[in-house]
Swiss-Prot record:
Any GO BP annotation: bidirectional double-stranded viral DNA replication
GO molecular function: single-stranded DNA binding
Main location: host cell
Compartment(s): Host nucleus
A GO cellular-component term linked to this record: host cell nucleus
This protein's name: Major DNA-binding protein
Organism the protein comes from: Human herpesvirus 8 type P (isolate GK18)
Residues spanning the membrane: none
Gene: DBP
C-alpha cells in the first residue's frame, strides 16, 4: 500500500481522499431496482427487520462513490474542522421496507437460537439505548419520495460505525442529493457526527438512531471482533473501539478489565504470565488490527456490479438469478471448510502455552505461546483478573457431550441470525458425507416424521423442509468434534489472494532475487529464470496444440505412432529447454544445488477489504483472519517483553498501565516487513488548506448555507498493511522432526512392480485404449499390468507388431526412467502436467535431490452440478409435510445445485486469477543469523484438521502403491475459487492476441531447430502447407524470409520447392505435396572420417598413410600423441 518510486511520501490514496461526511442515508426508488438479485446478495431471514447488502457500484452506490474519505468529525474552533481519514464499511444496512426482499434462508427461529446460545456461552447481549432528543424519520423528510415507493439503507465509514451504533450521527436533509445507480434512481442524505454541531445546541439535534441497525452492528460485526479478541463483553469492545478512533486512544489499554480468563489456567506463576500475555495480545490486536481495518484501501474491479462477467450471457432476469446462485454455490466450498475444519479461525478460543515436555530446546522457545483451538473450552468456567467469577461454565446437560451442536454453529456465526442465515444458505449447496457409524441416517424419513413434529422448538413443525434442524441433521456427520485440545495446530483463514504468487512446482526457485537483495552487483549475463522456463515450456506446448485449458488428446493422438510421436516431442522439448536453463544457471554462477534447499511456494493474502468476496460472512472471516494473524505475530514479542518485566504478583490491568505504551511502540517496528506481513506507513496531507463545508447552525434549522473551513488531520501517519505472505517449504529438511515424519518423505529405494500402471502414461493409455487398440476387448489396466510384468510383448488383433513393439518399449523405458527421477509423487493427468512434472523432476535430479520426496501444493476448486433433490429438502421451501410418502411425491422430478471440489485445476493457473482462498497457516518465529537478535516471523502453510472438510483431503491410496498416513504431510492443499471471469473481467493486453502469421512462424522455427533433420527445406514446406494450405501458391520471397527468420538462407530452396509443387498441379495438402517433393529430395546419410582413420586422400595410398617415410613426422597425428608419433618415425 505504501507508494514507492518517484512519488513522495505524501502522494498516496490517503492524501488523495476527499473530505466528506461520516456516512450516508440512501433512499432507493423501488422501480427498476433488481429486488431479486439483491435478495440473493443479502442476509435476511423471515423475522429480520434489517439486513445488509454489499457495497457495490451499480447496485448500492453510484459509480463515482469515494471509498476513502477524510470524514469531518468536529470543529476545533470557529474556522477549523478536524477530519479523520477512514474508508467505507463494505455493507449497506437496509432498514426501511425490508419486506420487499426475500430471505436468503427461510428457516424460522434463528433469533431464538442465537439469543439462547449467546447466554449459554456467557456473551453479553444487546441493550437498546434510550435517547431523549428527537430521532430522524424518513416520513419527516420532504426531499424524499413517498415512503412506500422507496426502501432505505445506511452506509457508514469504518471509523464511525460505533457512532452509528450509539445514535450519534446527525442527518442533514438540506443536502439531499439525487443520484443514478445503474438503471435505478436514489437519493442520499449525508450523516455528520454530533460533535460537529457543538455542545451548545446538542438538544436541538435530530439524530439518526435505529435500534434494529444497532442490534445488527452488535451481533454481526462487533461480536465477531470480540470473539477474535477473546472478550465476552461486546459492549466494552464497542466503547473501546469508539474511544480509540474518536479520541485517538491507540496507545492505552482499553479491554483488559473486561477480559476473563480460564479458571483452571489462571493460577500460579504461569497463570499470571498467561493472563498478562493474553491481555497484551488482545490490546495490541485491538489497537493495530482495528487501525488496519479503518485505514484507506485501494478500489478494485470486484465492486463494479455492472461489469461482473457472470452476467455477460444472461438475457433474462431469471438467468441472472441463476448465475448468482451458481456463483454462491462455488463460494460455499470455503464456508464449508471453515465450519467443518477443527482448526478453523472461527474456533480459536484462548491463548495457551506449550507444556515443557513438548518443547525441544531453544529452537521452540519463540513458539511456546500460541492461539489454541477447541470448542470444548467454551464450556469452561472463567474468572476476572482479580479471581472473581466471571462465567460459571456451561452445564453438561445443555450440550451433547463431544458432539457438535446447533449452539456451536451459532457461536461460529457470532450469534448473529443474519450471519447464521447466510451460512445455512451456503450449507444447502454442500453434500452430506454419511458416516458408517450412522446407520439410522435417512433424510426422507426424518423430513417426513421427526421434522414435522411440534417438538421442534424453532419452527414447531411448520416448515420441516427448510428448518435449520433438518439442515443440521443432514450435515451433522461433517462437523468437527467438540474437544479441548492441547496442541499447536495451524488455523484456517479465508480471504483473497494477492497479485503475485509463486505457485509453480518449484515455487520461487532461480528468481535470481537473492543475490541482488544481498547487495551483490547485477551481472550482465542474461538470466533465464525458472518463471521464464515455465512460460517457454507452456508456449512450446501450445505450438504443438497442447494447452493448460484442454489437451485435445483425441485430436493429437489417433494411433500408436502418433502417441509415441506426441510424447517424444514433449520429451525433446523439455530436454532442450532444461539444457538451456541449466547452462544459464552455470553461466551466472548460480549455486542451484544449495539454493534448491530453500525454495518455497509463496501465496499472498490481500489485506484490502474491497477485494474480499461481496458477502457479510466473508467480511467477518476477513476481519477474524486479519486480527488473528496480527495477534499471532505479536505473541513472541509479548512473551519476551514479559520475561524482562515479570508480571508475578501484579494483575494484568496494573501491569499494562506501566508497559503497554512501550510495547505498542516496539511492535510498530516488529510488525511489517519481518516476514509475514508487508505494508507501509502513509503520511496523510490535505492538498488544500481549506475544504467546502456548511454552516452548522443553519443546517439545524433545515437550511443549507455553504462555508469554507480550514482542515486539520487528526492522525497524519497511518500504518496500512498490504499482504500476508504465506510460504510452503518444498524440499524436505532432515534436520529436525520425528521418524514418522521422515518416513513420509523418504523415497523407497526399490522399484515398484507396477511402475507402468502407476506411472505417467497410464492415464493416457487408459483414455486412448480404444484408439490405440480398436479391436481388443482386454481392459487397459489388465493389459499394461501384464506388460509390465514380462519382457515379452502381446499379440493384439488389428495392431501392427512393429508399432506395438515400439509403443511397449517406449512406455517401459520411459516409465522406468520417470520412476527413477520422480521425487514429486504426482501422477500426470494432462499432457501439460506430464511435461511440467518431467521438467521439474529433472531439475530436482540435477540439483541432487533424489532421496526425499518434495512437498507438492494442490488446489481444490469448486465444480457445480445439478442432482436429484431427494436428499436436499430445502428445495421445497416452507411447506408443510405429514409423511415420507408426501415428501417423495413433492420432491419427485426436482433438481438442486450442489458443489463438489476437484483437483484437476492447476494451482499455478488458479493463482493468477485472483482467487478467494481458504488456507491453513501457522506463524513461526525465529531470530536472525550471524548474531542478529531481531525476531522474524514466517507464515507457513499448514493442514486442514477434520475428516469432514472435503473428501479430497482424506488420506488417499495411489494406485498400486502403499502410502503411510504421514505421507499426507508432503501433500498440501489450498481451496481456491477464482474471481477473474466471475466478478473481475480478464485483462486483455494490447499484444495478448496472436496473429496467424506469428503462430505459423513459431511452428516453422520449431521445425528449424531440429538439428538431426537432413532435409529441413522439405519439412519447412510441409509445415507451411499444413498451416496455410493453398495460400502457399502465392507466397512471395518476403513472406518466406519472414517465416524463416534467422534461417533465411534457406529461402531460395524453399521457394524452389514451392514452385515445383505449383507446377506439378497437385492439391495443396500434406499428402499431395509430399508425393512431389519426395522424389526431389531423398534422405541421405553422411559418413564422417576422423583425421587418423585410413582413407585415400588426393591419390595417396592407404599403405603410404599407414607406413610414412622415415624421418618425416606424420601430420595426421593429434597433439597428445606427438611424442609417440616421433618415436614411431625413428629408424631404430
Amino acid at each position: 500500500m505504501a507508494l514507492k518510486g518517484p512519488q513522495t511520501l505524501e502522494e498516496n490514496i490517503g492524501s488523495a481522499a476527499p473530505t466528506g461526511p461520516c456516512g450516508y442515508l440512501y433512499a432507493y426508488v423501488t422501480h427498476n431496482f433488481p429486488i431479486g438479485e439483491a435478495s440473493l446478495l443479502g442476509n435476511g431471514y423471515p423475522e429480520a427487520k434489517v439486513f445488509s447488502l454489499p457495497l457495490l457500484h451499480g447496485l448500492t452506490v453510484e459509480s463515482d462513490f469515494p471509498l476513502n474519505v477524510k470524514a469531518v468529525h468536529k470543529k476545533i474552533d470557529a474556522t477549523t474542522a478536524s477530519v479523520k481519514l477512514t474508508s467505507y464499511h463494505r455493507e449497506a444496512i437496509v432498514f426501511h421496507n425490508t419486506h420487499l426482499f426475500q430471505p436468503i434462508f427461510q428457516g424460522k427461529g434463528l433469533e431464538k437460537l442465537c439469543r439462547e446460545s449467546r447466554e449459554l456461552f456467557g456473551f453479553s447481549t444487546f441493550v437498546e439505548q434510550q435517547h431523549k432528543g428527537t430521532l430522524w424519520s424518513p416520513e419527516a423528510c420532504p426531499q424524499l419520495p413517498c415512503a412506500n415507493e422507496i426502501f432505505m439503507a445506511v452506509i457508514v465509514t469504518e471509523g464511525f460505525k460505533e457512532r452509528l451504533y450509539g445514535g450519534k450521527l446527525v442527518p442533514v436533509p438540506s443536502q439531499t442529493t439525487p443520484v443514478h445507480i445503474g438503471e435505478h434512481q436514489a437519493f442520499k442524505i449525508p450523516l455528520y457526527d454530533e460533535d460537529l454541531f457543538g455542545p451548545s445546541r446538542a438538544q436541538e439535534l435530530c439524530r439518526f438512531y435505529n435500534p434494529d441497525i444497532s442490534r445488527y452492528l452488535h451481533d454481526s460485526i462487533f461480536t465477531g471482533i470480540a470473539q477474535a479478541l477473546r472478550v465476552k463483553d461486546v459492549s466494552t469492545v464497542i466503547q473501546a473501539s469508539e474511544r480509540q478512533f474518536v479520541h485517538d486512544q491507540y496507545k492505552i489499554p482499553k479491554l483488559v478489565q473486561a477480559k476473563d480468563f480460564p479458571q483452571c489456567a489462571s493460577r500460579g506463576t504461569d497463570g499470571s504470565t498467561l493472563m498478562v500475555i493474553d491481555s497484551l495480545v488482545a490490546e495490541l490486536g485491538m489497537s493495530y488490527g482495528l487501525s488496519f481495518i479503518e485505514g484507506p484501501q485501494d478500489s478494485c474491479e470486484v465492486l463494479n456490479y455492472d461489469t461482473w462477467p457472470i452476467f455477460e450471457n444472461c438475457e433474462t432476469p431469471d438467468a441472472r438469478l441463476r448465475a448468482l446462485e451458481v456463483w454462491h454455490a462455488e463460494q460455499a466450498l470455503h464456508i464449508g471448510a471453515q465450519l467443518f475444519a477443527a482448526n478453523s479461525v472461527l474456533y480459536l478460543t484462548r491463548v495457551a502455552k506449550l507444556p515443557q515436555k513438548n518443547q525441544r530446546g531453544d529452537a521452540n522457545m519463540y513458539n511456546s505461546f500460541y492461539l489454541q483451538h477447541g470448542l470444548g473450552y467454551l464450556s469452561e468456567a472463567t474468572v476476572k483478573e482479580n479471581g472473581a467469577s466471571a462465567f460459571k461454565g456451561v452445564p453438561v446437560s445443555a450440550l451433547d457431550g463431544s458432539s457438535y451442536t446447533l449452539q456451536h454453529l451459532a457461536y461460529a456465526s457470532s450469534f448473529s441470525p443474519h450471519l447464521l442465515a447466510r451460512m445455512c444458505y451456503y450449507l444447502q449447496f454442500l453434500p452430506h458425507h454419511k458416516n458408517t457409524n450412522s446407520q439410522s441416517y435417512n433424510v426422507v424419513d426424518y423430513v417426513g416424521t421427526a421434522a414435522p413434529s411440534q417438538m421442534c422448538d424453532l419452527c414447531q413443525g411448520q416448515c420441516p423442509a427448510v428448518c435449520i434442524n433438518t439442515l443440521f441433521y443432514r450435515m451433522k456427520d461433517r462437523f468437527p468434534p467438540v474437544l479441548s485440545n492441547v496442541k499447536r495446530d495451524p488455523y484456517v483463514i479465508t480471504g483473497t489472494a494477492g497479485t503475485y504468487n509463486d505457485l509453480e512446482i518449484l515455487g520461487n526457485f532461480a528468481t535470481f532475487r537473492e543475490r541482488e537483495e544481498e547487495g551483490n552487483p547485477v551481472e550482465d549475463a542474461p538470466k533465464y529464470t525458472y518463471w521464464q522456463l515455465c512460460q517457454n515450456i507452456t508456449e512450446k506446448l501450445a505450438s504443438m496444440g497442447i494447452s493448460e485449458g484442454g489437451d485435445a488428446l483425441r485430436t493429437l493422438i489417433v494411433d500408436i505412432p502418433s502417441f509415441v510421436k506426441v510424447f517424444k516431442g514433449i520429451d525433446s522439448t523439455v530436454e532442450a529447454e532444461l539444457l538451456k536453463f541449466i547452462n544459464c544457471m552455470i553461466k551466472n554462477n548460480y549455486n542451484f544445488r544449495e539454493n534448491i534447499k530453500s525454495v518455497h511456494h509463496i501465496l499472498q493474502f490481500a489485506c484490502n477489504v474491497y477485494w474480499q468476496a461481496p458477502c457479510p460472512v466473508f467480511l467477518t472471516l476477513y476481519y477474524k483472519s486479519l486480527l488473528t494473524v496480527i495477534q499471532d505475530i505479536c505473541l513472541t514479542s509479548c512473551m519476551m517483553y514479559e520475561q524482562d518485566n515479570p508480571a508475578v504478583g501484579i494483575v494484568p490491568s496494573e501491569w499494562l498501565k506501566m508497559h503497554f505504551q512501550t510495547m505498542w511502540t516496539n511492535f510498530k517496528g516488529a510488525c511489517f516487513d519481518k516476514g509475514a506481513i508487508t505494508g507501509g506507513e502513509l503520511k496523510i496531507v490535505h492538498q488544500s488548506m481549506f475544504c467546502d463545508l456548511f454552516d452548522t447552525d443553519a443546517a439545524i434549522g433545515g437550511m443549507f448555507a455553504p462555508a469554507r473551513m480550514q482542515v486539520r488531520i487528526a492522525r497524519a501517519m497511518l500504518m496500512v498493511p498490504k499482504t500476508i505472505k504465506i510460504k510452503n517449504r518444498i524440499i524436505f529438511s532432515n534436520s529436525t522432526g520425528a521418524e514418522s515424519i521422515q518416513a513420509g518423505f523418504m523415497k523407497p529405494a526399490s522399484q515398484r512392480d507396477s511402475y507402468i500402471v502407476g506411472g505417467p502414461y497410464m492415464k493416457f493409455l487408459n483414455a486412448l485404449h480404444k484408439t490405440l487398440f480398436p479391436s481388443t476387448k482386454t481392459s487397459a489396466l489388465y493389459l499394461w499390468h501384464k506388460i509390465g510384468q514380462t519382457t515379452k510383448n502381446p499379440i493384439l488383433p488389428g495392431v501392427s507388431g512393429e508399432h506395438l513393439t515400439e509403443l511397449c518399449n517406449y512406455v517401459k523405458a520411459s516409465s522406468q526412467a520417470f520412476e527413477e527421477i520422480n521425487v514429486l509423487d504426482l501422477v500426470p493427468d494432462t499432457l501439460t502436467s506430464y511435461a511440467k512434472i518431467k521438467l521439474n523432476s529433472s531439475i530436482l535430479r540435477a540439483c541432487g535431490q533424489t532421496q526425499f520426496y518434495a512437498t507438492t501444493l494442490s488446489c481444490l476448486s469448486p465444480v457445480t452440478q445439478l442432482v436429484p433433490a431427494e436428499e436436499y429438502p430445502h428445495v421445497l421451501g416452507p411447506v408443510g409435510l405429514s409423511s415420507p410418502d408426501e415428501y417423495r411425491v413433492k420432491v419427485a422430478g426436482r433438481s438442486v445445485t450442489i458443489v463438489q471440489s476437484t483437483l484437476k485445476q492447476a494451482v499455478s493457473t488458479n493463482g493468477r486469477l485472483r482467487p478467494i482462498i481458504t488456507v491453513p497457516l501457522v506463524v513461526n518465529k525465529y531470530t536472525g543469523s550471524n548474531g542478529n537478535t531481531n525476531v522474524f516471523h514466517c507464515a507457513n502453510l499448514g493442514y486442514f484438521s477434520g475428516r469432514g472438510v472435503d473428501r479430497n483431503l482424506r488420506p488417499e491410496s495411489v494406485p498400486f502403491k502403499k502410502n503411510n498416513v504421514s505421507s499426507m504431510l508432503r501433500k498440501r492443499h489450498v481451496i481456491m475459487t477464482p474471481l477473474v471471469d466471475r466478478l473481475v473481467k480478464r485483462i486483455v493486453g494490447i499484444n495478448s492476441g496472436e496473429f496467424e502469421a506469428e503462430a505459423v512462424k513459431r511452428s516453422v522455427q520449431n521445425v528449424l531447430e531440429d538439428r538431426d533433420n537432413p532435409n529441413l527445406p522439405k519439412t519447412v514446406v510441409l509445415e507451411l502447407v499444413k498451416h496455410l494450405g493453398s495460400s502457399c501458391a502465392s507466397l512471395t520471397e518476403e513472406d518466406v524470409i519472414y517465416y524463416l527468420g534467422p534461417y533465411a538462407v534457406l529461402g531460395d530452396e524453399v521457394l524452389s520447392l514451392l514452385s515445383t509443387v505449383g507446377q506439378a498441379g497437385v492439391p495443396w495438402t500434406a499428402e499431395g505435396v509430399a508425393s512431389v517433393i519426395q522424389d526431389i529430395i531423398d534422405d541421405c546419410e553422411l559418413q564422417f572420417v576422423g583425421p587418423e582413420e585410413p582413407c585415400l586422400i588426393q591419390g595417396q595410398s592407404v599403405v603410404e598413410e599407414l607406413f610414412p617415410s622415415p624421418g618425416v613426422p606424420s601430420l595426421t597425428v593429434g597433439k597428445k600423441r606427438k611424442i609417440a608419433s616421433l618415436l614411431s618415425d625413428l629408424d631404430l
